[in-house]
Design a protein with these regions (language model features):
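Mature, soluble, non-transmembrane domains
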Residues: 98-217
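A sequence-level detector of short, solvent-exposed, charge-rich linear segments
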Residues: 15-16, 53, 60, 130, ...
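Bacterial N-terminal signal peptides
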Residues: 8-16
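Bacterial Sec-dependent signal peptides at the C-terminal "C-region" and cleavage site
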Residues: 15-23
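Bacterial N-terminal signal peptides that target proteins for export
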Residues: 1-8
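N-terminal Sec/ER secretory leader and immediately downstream segment
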Residues: 22-99
């Protein structure tokens, strides 16, 4: 716990001054426990019943935060919120950060600062920082919706959405925007979305939901 607090404090200091200095770009993936590609009638029925948990993953292609280069490194945020994510929150969310195990201490602080700058208040209450191998592969399918994230106890795998097979009410759209700012992403089907670790209130396995985003990010 002491190590976690020290690293979080270092990241907070870095975040307050040079959170995205030099610019960072890379790949992004997200999955939630509710549909994000849906119609208003279905979204309204799920509000504050589901969608309180999410996994967000960033894999840096190239970038600098402060004096730390973080090329090729990744970080994942596991979030448990009080209300459906994307709606007004009545209490603070809890978050566990899974930091790339290859990063040195300066890079770890830089990755945490970067994630906090992207996810904002969702990462205001980080209850644990863990280290894991972070792999994010974005497949080259025509629609750009196929990706896979593996990071210790967190998993996401997506496929492209089909207007023919995945529509239910007929007026689906990206009802909830991505939880990370500065991303260019499209909604996708989460064929796997799970978290089996500790730190937040629940573990989950939420496959077969239109609740993912896959794309890229770039900050300046």
């Amino acid at each position: 716990m002491k190590r976690t607090l020290v690293l979080a404090a270092a990241a907070a200091a870095l975040f307050s001054t040079t959170a995205t200095a030099g610019g960072v770009k890379g790949q992004y993936i997200e999955a939630r426990t509710c549909d994000v590609w849906t119609g208003p009638c279905f979204a309204n029925a799920e509000m504050n019943l589901g969608g309180k948990h999410a996994v967000l993953g960033w894999k840096v292609d190239k970038g600098t935060v402060g004096a730390a280069r973080i090329d090729g490194l990744g970080i994942v945020a596991v979030i448990a919120a009080s209300d459906t994510l994307g709606l007004k929150q009545t209490g603070p969310a809890k978050a566990v950060l899974l930091v790339d195990e290859r990063a040195d201490s300066a890079q770890r602080a830089a990755l945490i600062a970067f994630a906090k700058s992207q996810a904002g208040s969702l990462l205001a209450n980080v209850v644990a920082v863990q280290y894991a191998k972070v792999d994010l592969d974005v497949c080259g399918c025509d629609e750009g919706g196929c990706g896979k994230l593996t990071a210790g106890p967190a998993r996401i795998e997506t496929r492209c959405l089909s207007d023919k097979h995945d529509k239910i009410c007929g007026n689906e759209s990206e009802f909830y925007p991505p939880l990370s700012k500065g991303v260019k992403a499209r909604a996708a089907m989460a064929v796997e979305h799970s978290y089996s670790g500790q730190g937040v209130d629940e573990k989950w396995n939420d496959a077969g939901r239109r609740g993912a985003y896959l794309g890229s990010f770039e900050t300046r």
